[in-house]
Each structure stands twice: as structure tokens, then as C-alpha cells.
Amino acid sequence: MKSIIEVKDLSFRYKEDQDHYDVNNVSFHVKRGEWLSIVGHNGSGKSTTIRLIDGLLEAESGEIWIDGQLLSSENVWDLRRQIGMVFQNPDNQFVGATVEDDVAFGLENQGLPREEMKKRVAESLELVGMLDFKNREPARLSGGQKQRVAIAGVVALRPAILILDEATSMLDPEGRRELIQTVQEIRKDHQMTVVSITHDLELSLIHI
């Protein structure tokens, strides 16, 4: 199966005068539809690697290929549309007054027809079990519910790649398992590639 992410000899440091690299000569690939867990302690370069893949940071050396295209300053915005990211604290991602408005926000930026937008919002909220909460304020949801809404907002955009950057670290063990199970179902149903960043080795094995 063809690789949708290919990283070759990637190196990066936040300051040029640093003695050490935050990411040093890293290479890996992810096949379409796979689930890759990147596990490591805080400060090991996990999130930095993901930000390089998403084009939020620029590598000092090496190559990043997304779906057969070499990531560059010319195509970074186009390739970024293929990637959806969910972060540790979903409160930083919410922009809508209601759950429904928040999931619709990204679709509005894409200029989708209103009926198609409503359909995608409903489908995405249904997928994560949050359709009954569509009129709630995101701030009034539990931690697990907030993460489900954040995932729905990403899934509605139909990216080829979903990146979870410590997205379950603020949840209790049961909430983590439920969220991972939900993402696993979405991955299978939509042939989505998932990259999960975590420091929890046990959590990285749940989806297997």
C-alpha cells in the first residue's frame, strides 16, 4: 500500500546556536489507512515532528512527502488541507457559540453550500456520539465531550490524515479508551490515516 506520509532524514532545532537538535535525522513512513503512534517522554520531539509535517514549522534539513508531494512553501497550504489536528486542550480550538456552530466553522471557510454543510455537521456529530448536544455551549461540556466535538470538527473537513497531539492526556482512563475506540471506528469507516502523539505506552496499544 502506498505511503501517505514519508519523512526522510528530518532535522530541526528551534535556535540555530543550539548544541542539540530537537528533531535529529528522523525517518519514517505511514501507509494510507494506518494508525501510527509516536511515543516518547515530554521534550522528546514528538509534537515538534508533527508540527513539521503540518508545515507549522520549517525543517532545517530533510524531506516531508504528503500523498506523493514534497512539502514546500509553495504547496504548504494545499497539503495542510489534507491534515486535521486535535490538540491536548480543545478549549483553544473552539470558536462557535454552540457545538453545531463550532463544527460548521471550518466548512464555512471552505464555502460549502448550506445544505451540504448541515449534512456534514450532523454526520460528524453522529459519528462521535454528540449529535444530541449540538445546541450546547462547548465550554459547558465535559473534557471527553469537548474532545469528541473537536474531532467532529476535523472529521467534517474530511482530511486524509488525522493527527491527535496528546488529545487524550486530560481524560480519565475510561474516557481515553472510549475516545480512541471512536477514532478507530472513524478510521475504518473513512479510510483515514491516524497519527497519535502520546507519552502513554499503554494508550498507544489500545487501537491494535
List the predicted regions and their residue ranges.
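Conserved ABC ATPase signature
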Residues: E137-L141, Q145
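Catalytic Walker B motif of ABC-type/P-loop ATPase nucleotide-binding domains
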Residues: L162-D165
